[in-house]
Amino acid sequence: MKFVLLFGVLVVTLFSYSSAEMLDDFDQADEDELLSLIEKEEARAKECTPRFYDCSHDRHSCCRSELFKDVCTCFYPEGGDNEVCTCQQPKHLKYMEKAAGKAKKFGGKIKKWFG
């Protein structure tokens, strides 16, 4: 009975050690992947397309506004056959940015009043 108990403890210890090693390997791989994604995002951020400019060459290249990324919106102008794509900010995001700006100002006033 003691042998079975000792063997069980040994198996559980080895299993937990091996799973901890595997988790460390996964964490390191995730960390490396995250760093490479950040580097790619920084490189891509330097080449963004400003608002109301043509984004048909790369529809994911629109710049970020204060809080949200602009969206490449495509449409056909009236009486035209060619599709036109420009970076634009959706209205609901525009209103959310305005509300966030007003909330920041109001928060600053409250902080000023109650110091």
Curated annotation (Swiss-Prot):
Q: Where in the cell is it found?
A: Secreted
Q: Where, by tissue, is this protein expressed?
A: Expressed by the venom gland.
Asked if the record carries the keyword S-adenosyl-L-methionine, the reply is: no
Which Pfam family, any one, appears in the UniProt record?
Toxin_35
Cystines in this chain: C48-C63, C55-C72, C62-C87, C74-C85
Those residues forming the propeptide, per the database entry, are 21-44
Span-the-membrane segments of this chain are none
Which PROSITE patterns does the record associate with it? SPIDER_CSTX
Q: Which keywords, in A-to-Z order, does the entry hold?
A: Disulfide bond, Knottin, Secreted, Signal, Toxin
Give a GO molecular function annotation for the protein: toxin activity
GO CC terms, sorted: extracellular region
The region annotated as signal peptide is: 1-20
Family annotation (InterPro entries): Spider_toxin_CSTX_knottin, Spider_toxin_CSTX_Knottin_CS
Q: Where primarily located?
A: secreted
> Keyword Repeat, does the record have it?
no
Q: What is known of its domains?
A: The presence of a 'disulfide through disulfide knot' structurally defines this protein as a knottin.
- What does the similarity note say? Belongs to the neurotoxin 19 (CSTX) family. 01 subfamily.
Protein name per Swiss-Prot or TrEMBL: U3-lycotoxin-Ls1k
Gene source species: Lycosa singoriensis (Wolf spider)
